[in-house]
Amino acid sequence: MFRQSLLESVKARLLHPQFQALPLHARIQRAIRQLILDGALAPGNPLPASRALAQSLGVSRDTVEAAYSHLHAEGFIERRVGSGSVVAAATRLSPGRRGAGAPRRVGGAPRLSRRGEAMQAGGGVREQLVPLPFAPGVPETRTFPLATWERLQRQVLKEYGARALTHGDPQGAEPLRQAIADYVNLERGARATADRVLVLTSSQQALGLCASVLLDAGERIFVEDPAYYGARKAFEAAGLECLPVPVDEQGLRPEPILAQPQAARALCLTPSHHYPTGVTLSLERRLALIEWAQRQQAWIIEDDYDSEFHYAGRPTACVQGLDAHERTLYIGTFTKSLFPGLRIGYMVLPPALVAPMTVARSLQDGHNASLAQLTLARFIAGGHFGAYVRGMRNLYGERLGFLAERVGKRLGGLVEPRVPAGGLQMPGL
């Protein structure tokens, strides 16, 4: 028979709120299993007869029998005809047991790799699930046409059936890759075809892939100063050394790069709207950086985040579209243009990088959900995306003007608003 303390442990598990959703026999089975793993029940120790334990716990004998049967199937106990149930010999190696004289480990922080320690020390990219007031880069989601999205999703399910629920192409669903290529060619002047598009979950994933596939730990990469913190964190997590390059009213200054052209093998840019200042990289500087990348066989990582929201005139063509040398990787996302919960971003890649990048992403998370990809493809192809972006561009432009006016009026002398040409942030001086 159990010692009274062991019986009380089983009873406590039966009554604990954490386990109330489990069937009664599962609670008994897990309680006894934990006693074995903790070493409270040693190999060869007999278990009480099912009838006796049932009476002690106030449950039916069938319930205890079901618990014992599960423990036997898992290998925790042995059932012997005529001699009852005993703890199996194999549990001698269970994690909770200590050999004679073995020191007891004191709890504490787990030992991490240097890379893991660096990532933990640097913190995550998003720690606030609910955005704080005036937080930059947060899209408005209350105006999204949910009814249209739901209708398109039903169409996808009707056409594809269960195929929309299975594993998909690691490179991304072909209809979405084609829709993305058509869009960036038209709106951003890119050089894109469907077979050069890699669908991802976010721009953050794209930055991480660039860091790990293009460069080795210990190598250096040029970054804007100030830079988007998510990019810097992705590069540092991959073991890269970030070399800051100053930014002025025309964007990143190329002179420090051209003065030391071999100092780094890659450059990360936000040329459309630099984060956080919002300035746009001039055409002259774009061309100079493209030539630098060609001469040094370096890579340009172009993060074209929220380029859809340009409030003054036509935006300059993306760097990737100007680069005839195929040294630029273009990153885009639907996080800000649609909604963050969609979790779809993409890269437009040089042909030689499509295969290695696709393999690398498949090792991370396989692929994006097919249903969301196919629904988004219809949303874009049907003209809904363009219409929605135009409406949101007007809304954000109005809000930007209102905020700038109120800041100037209420905080004049303390803060000078710097109204950017585009984007979802407004810096101040």
Where are these regions (language model features)?
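Active-site PLP attachment segment
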Residues: 322-356, 368-371
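N-terminal basic, amphipathic alpha-helical segments
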Residues: 1-156, 352, 358, 362-369, ...
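Conserved functional loop/turn residues at catalytic and ligand-binding sites
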Residues: 40, 75, 239, 304, ...
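Domain-scale detector for complete catalytic domains at protein termini or as standalone homologs
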Residues: 48, 235, 257, 328, ...
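Short glycine-rich anion-binding loops that position phosphate/pyrophosphate groups of nucleotides
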Residues: 139, 271-275, 336
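Conserved core of the PLP fold type I
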Residues: 153-297, 308-325, 329, 396
